Regions:
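RNA-binding accessory domains that recognize and position tRNA/RNA substrates
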Residues: 1-61, 72-84, 88-126, 157
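ATP-dependent adenylate-handling ligase core
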Residues: 90-182
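Metallo-beta-lactamase
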Residues: 64
Length: 182
């Protein structure tokens, strides 16, 4: 069970969805969660954005390098030619495929839809300096993406976050009988 106390600017607002969070988080990674919220005293200074990120976006969308996110990206770009999307992604340096796939896909999408999107270069995520055994199931990828997407959406004042997922991952089958989801 994970018990986490999150610092937030408005704990009363977050407490209205605390029970939903405690139900949602286990679905995303299979662990049992107990979240609490406390008043954050640190004030985050908003930095100016590069020009390419200051143009409004209709949505922030995952571009993982996989087929589901590629189809989601192409569907949006084709169906909404006057709107822009901000692609976000992350990679684990131990897995060599996703980062290269993400770069290749961005390069190909750029050829046709260059004015309809921006991307935040794929963020490297790893636990290099830890003695904790390595997680090999990738069951937290969705949670990590949502965190990155929330930061990107807040920074660009974008209201919609899309996780294009159509396959078995979207069903989140448990990895073992002791898990509720993967």
């Amino acid at each position: 069970e994970l018990k986490v106390n999150f610092p937030v600017h408005n704990p009363a607002k977050w407490n209205t969805c605390k029970e939903e969070m405690n139900k949602l988080l286990p679905f995303l990674n299979g662990d049992y969660w107990n979240v609490e919220f406390r008043k954050e005293t640190f004030d985050v200074q908003k930095a100016g954005l590069d020009k390419e990120y200051s143009v409004p976006f209709a949505q922030v969308s995952l571009l993982s390098g996989g087929l589901d996110s590629l189809i989601g990206a192409l569907d949006f770009l084709k169906q909404a030619p006057k709107q822009r999307v901000l692609f976000v992604s992350h990679y684990d340096p131990q897995m060599h495929g996703p980062k290269g796939d993400q770069k290749d896909l961005i390069a190909e999408i750029q050829k046709i839809y260059s004015k309809q999107f921006a991307d935040i270069p794929s963020l490297r995520v790893s636990l290099d300096r830890t003695n904790v055994s390595r997680e090999t199931t990738f069951r937290s990828r969705s949670l990590l993406f949502l965190g990155i997407a929330l930061i990107a959406a807040q920074a660009t004042n974008t209201q919609s976050i899309i996780v294009p997922e159509n396959g078995t991952v979207s069903l989140n089958f448990p990895l073992s009988p002791s898990r509720r989801s993967s």
